């Protein structure tokens, strides 16, 4: 399908619209400062992602802040450090201040003229409304990672066909077409492993504009 054939975009929040990795690293810096030597950025993020993935089955029990708090504590234990629950909660609350990528607001403003925009992610209730306002979407269009498949099934007639805008590290999401946003990655000459492979949300806007001219 062409870019202009979709009715809705299901856009991953973190690392597509929100610079989660930079936010996580900044919030982990006090813990990292306690280590002997600074591990590479990629290593820290890989360990963080592993811990979060292992905790995610408990999301319904822990909630978003609880999950991040436990992730902080488990990272400290991995690194042979002590971290208080207060430090863990401070880390969890930092998610409310994670920055948007520079191109995200303008891209969302443009794309909502042509699509229904659905954002896929998790946040605490008190942060969700503010984030939706920053992204220019209605609160009901911010869909939890735990509920997205059921939601899409229930809303099929209103939103399909849907293009899933995600990052390369995320597995294929059901039968949805995929657009991979490869931020901070050089363009690869190898074959694209999705329906679309682009470098940023600004690039998605540019590709859509090209499609309109064809």
Where are these regions (language model features)?
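Secondary-structure boundary/capping signal
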Residues: 36-40, 83, 115, 119, ...
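N-terminal helical cap/lid subdomain that shapes the substrate entry/recognition surface
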Residues: 3-102
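Residue-level marker of alpha-helix boundaries and capping positions
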Residues: 63, 98, 119, 161-162
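Glycine-centered loop/turn motif at secondary-structure junctions
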Residues: 36, 80, 114-115, 136, ...
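Substrate-recognition element of Asp-dependent hydrolases with the DxDx(T/V) motif
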Residues: 83-133, 143-145
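Asp-based, Mg2+/Mn2+-dependent phosphohydrolase catalytic module
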Residues: 1-9, 109, 120-214
